[in-house]
Amino acid sequence: MPTSPSREVAVDATKVELVSKPLLASAALNKFSGYHFNPSSSGVDSNLLILLHGLGDNDSGFFNLGQNLQKTLPQTAILTLQAPLKVPFLEGDHWMWYPAFDQFAELLTKPNPTVTVASVVALLDHLVGKCGWSAGSIHIFGFGQGATLALEVLISWSKSHSQPLGSIVSIHGSFISHPTISSSSTPVLHIYRSAREIPLDSTRWSSHRKSTSALTLHRLRGNEEDESMLKGSEWDSVMSFWSKFFRNRIKWELEGKVVPIG
């Protein structure tokens, strides 16, 4: 039985996703000590990867990392942020996302990331409201203190926004606050080092479980004290995770046309 030909239906131009999404100037960006943005090399910005460095670092190395990731990730723009606070007692380009040390250079037992969390959420609002990104197309990768910030941003965002973010990857991050709200559906990959597997139902992950209904844990072999960055094949779990959520828009999507089924 022959089928009738499909008709192309134009999409309302005001609702078509932009092909390119430049980073527009905003006071939200000025809350950070620096940032670098690089659009997708293909000219099609379908995914935005925000990279947050660790304690005492700066964003230059993560910008290089992001550019390398762009060679593999489809239609992905990158934005690296540099933490707003200088690390005390150190000379040079060393930054922290929130106060981490007391006056004796000892680590704080109860740090307060509230100010920087609010700054990142304000930036996300700018990216969604002014730059054309949907929240579901924004992915955050954090390492160390940057991973902790990413997890805290997830909690704050979920309290005030109904749309989930694209994903969160936490490398050695931890929660400072303890989520009490209903879980977000934002997918979260948390990577940790340990000599043994720590079950998902362990009390260690109670805050992680409360923060999202889509939690994935991945253990790297090693000592828990080893909080070094991923190396070589240790990236495999991250790339596999991202492959489930990063978009790759096809030609008819970019032309603002759809082909109805039936």
Swiss-Prot record:
It comes from the Eukaryota. Signal peptide: none annotated. Pfam families: Abhydrolase_2. This is Uncharacterized hydrolase UM10204. One of its GO terms (molecular function) is palmitoyl-(protein) hydrolase activity. Its EC number is 3.1.-.-. The keyword Hydrolase applies. Keywords: Hydrolase. GO terms for cellular component: cytoplasm. It is an enzyme of class 3 (hydrolase). PANTHER family: LYSOPHOSPHOLIPASE-RELATED, PHOSPHOLIPASE_CARBOXYLESTERASE SUPERFAMILY (AFU_ORTHOLOGUE AFUA_5G09340). InterPro entries: AB_hydrolase_fold, LYPA1-2/EST-like, PLipase/COase/thioEstase. Belongs to the AB hydrolase superfamily. AB hydrolase 2 family.
